[in-house]
Amino acid sequence: MKFSESWVREWVNPAISTAQLCDQITMLGLEVDGVEKVAGDFSGVVVGEVVECAQHPDADKLRVTKVNVGGDRLLDIVCGAPNCRQGLKVACATEGAVLPGDFKIKKTKLRGQPSEGMLCSFSELGIDVESSGIIELPQNAPVGTNLRDYLTLDDNTVEISLTPNRADCLSIAGIAREIGVVNKLAVNTPHFESVKATITDKVDIQLHAPEACPRYLLRVVKNVNVQAPSPMWLQEKLRRCGIRSIDPVVDVTNYILLELGQPMHAFDAAKVAQPVQVRMAKSGEALVLLDGSTAKLKDNTLLIADQNGPLAMAGIFGGQASGVNAETKDIILEAAFFAPLAIAGRARQYGLHTDSSHRFERGVDFELQRQAMERATALLVEICGGEVGDICEVASDAFLPKLNQVSLRREKLDALLGHHIETETVTDILTRLGLQVSYANDVWQVTSASWRFDIEIEEDLVEEIARIYGYNSIPNKAPLAHLRMREHKEADLDLARIKTALVDADYQEAITYSFVDPKIQSVLHPQQDALVLPNPISVEMSAMRLSLLSGLLGAVQYNQNRQQTRVRLFETGLRFIPDTQAEFGVRQEFVLAAVMTGNKKAEHWAGKAESVDFFDLKGDLESILSLTGTRNLVKFVAKSYPALHPGQSAAIMLNGEEIGFIGTLHPNAAKQLGLNGKTVVFEILWQAIATRQVVQAKEISRFPANRRDLAIVVAESVAASDVLDACREVAGETLTQVNLFDVYQGNGVAEGHKSLAISLIIQDNEKTLEEDDINAVVSVVLSELKQRFNAYLRD
């Protein structure tokens, strides 16, 4: 927001420099982005009056003038401006004046005619105003007055950045209020008399959406002269705040917006078919806006309408059909309180952003509308004349915001600030902020002001006290606390260890947004509802992720589109699962996910390129699990998932509970996501594997180990892991290792069956095993496999 320093100082004028004022504003939390002078550096320019104006005898585009600058005689000045004429009040640079760029004014002759000065335009004085010709000053401008004094040009435009919670400072009144509080100065609110009604005209209002518009005011002003020029002081104040002058009606509403922070609008009364309705848009309605564009309205948009249809998008943009123009005689002024949630995001969905919507979506003082209406009426009648009707107001108290009641404990205040502030000082600060305060038993009971939507909790009050007390007034003290050693169990597994292992395995870590495209997510999780954001950054980031795969696969596509065919990525983060049983209706789970695509190894002359498959990623996952305490407990059970290949996917099970999934991306899903080649993915709950197996040191056996290889035939549906688990369960402690080293299907093996080659390592720590001992272990294993899986030895 931009504002004029001199305008703020009309309200409150602390005895400090511009630099000090800007520093003070920044420390209040209203960060100053820049300060610019409102005019260039010049001197010797005064208010003049063109007494005579005649055509130059030797130049068609020049005029010879005599100008009164309040001296002993009239000055002869040659001027080329097309708007130069007799009786005009002008900005006259006299002999010796210095204009921006160190341009000095001297007596000279132009085409043979003497010229003792220069009639200046805005641009020649370094003033940013779009105009052609010289400056036209009001007729009551006093001749001979220094122009810098007359237009208050020794002023600065200050630009500040506001956080969304400080909508109360989007006005001169709000900024002045803050400066007054910190300097302990009273704010000089401009005095104006309420305009009494002189006509009986009223407007019938129908409030059909009170939850979106709890308060709505209209007022008729008839016989308005919209051709009247806006006074120079009004134009200058608008200009210094970054708004150009348009016509007196628009200028007045913009002035109220800047001064009080209340957006207003004016309708041409002749173009409004009463009653005026405040309602939600209907499907199929359209509105031609003031800029000539047509908005196709959505049913979530609040409208101002009449009997013939929409008049304006409430709080955002007016309609062309009901707008004020040069032929307008009677107007209807509007001031309203629109609920922030009814306006937030609506302007963006139509590609709009206005000063009005910027304020309404952050929150406008809900007690300001009548004051703003009175102030605007007074200014309008002063500038344009007119006859005024009564203010017509419709309000719904049930939907108006309620003032927040907040308790602040002395203990909490001291703990957060680390400094004790006297009770009287705290009470004084809160009172000066416009809050209602009472104190008893070391607790302040505070009622927020109507303009402070952001005062909701105890910490908000602590922040306010710290701002006004001054951060620099809080002494620096080293924290005093009892330190405790961080408890770290030997069984705890650090996530960084897993990340390092994945990086060592040629993966790269990715960090993607938690907000994802719902269309992409529906490809991966078609049967699962996601948490949809009501006010997203964009349509492509409007849903919370159900898994990390949406972001990771998007990263794979990004790399493939840039000729990176071999991609291995992993990510850790939260996924968000809608759950009515969880807090706030969403379950947040921390997971580890990885994807791989392309060749198994980088291109090399000694080897043939092979594409990755399910078992490559499974092997990497098993390597990760080997660092945890769950490696021998985790099982991979065949299971189908909508986005995965039905023959190449599995659930990751731990103690009978599914903790993740792994598989090859379904070709149809890969096509929809724009991916090339085979892509393999996994995702697993981190907390389920976040412990590691504590190493148990054992003496190496002095006795020889014995290996026995078995080739057993089982049904094709039997999982090899189940076979290995069965061996471990029945063989006893002498079976130290069991491994699968070959799988065969073909000649010699019945159809629908497969041959599993497994090795048994049998060893005793107490003695050398005899052949009978070894055969006994093998016999027990074969018997169990036959009973459980109907397995038999392959011939």
Curated annotation (Swiss-Prot):
Residues annotated for Mg(2+) binding in this entry: D454, D460, E463, E464
InterPro entries: aa-tRNA-synth_II/BPL/LPL, B3/B4_tRNA-bd, DNA-bd_dom_put_sf, Fdx_antiC-bd, Fdx_antiC-bd_sf, NA-bd_OB-fold, Phe-tRNA-ligase_IIc_bsu, Phe-tRNA-ligase_IIc_bsu_bact
Subcellular location: Cytoplasm
Top-rank EC class of the record's enzyme: ligase
Entry EC number(s): 6.1.1.20
Keyword ATP-binding listed: yes
CC cofactor note: Binds 2 magnesium ions per tetramer.
Cofactor(s) in the UniProt record: Mg(2+)
Gene Ontology biological process terms from the UniProt entry: phenylalanyl-tRNA aminoacylation
Residues in the signal sequence: none
Superkingdom per UniProt: Bacteria
Chain ranges of the tRNA-binding domain: 39-148
Family: Belongs to the phenylalanyl-tRNA synthetase beta subunit family. Type 1 subfamily.
UniProt cross-references to NCBIfam families, sorted A to Z: pheT_bact (TIGR00472), YtpR (NF045760)
Subunit and interaction comment: Tetramer of two alpha and two beta subunits.
HAMAP family: Phe_tRNA_synth_beta1
Name of the protein: Phenylalanine--tRNA ligase beta subunit
Source organism of the structure: Pasteurella multocida (strain Pm70)
Name of the gene this protein is made from: pheT
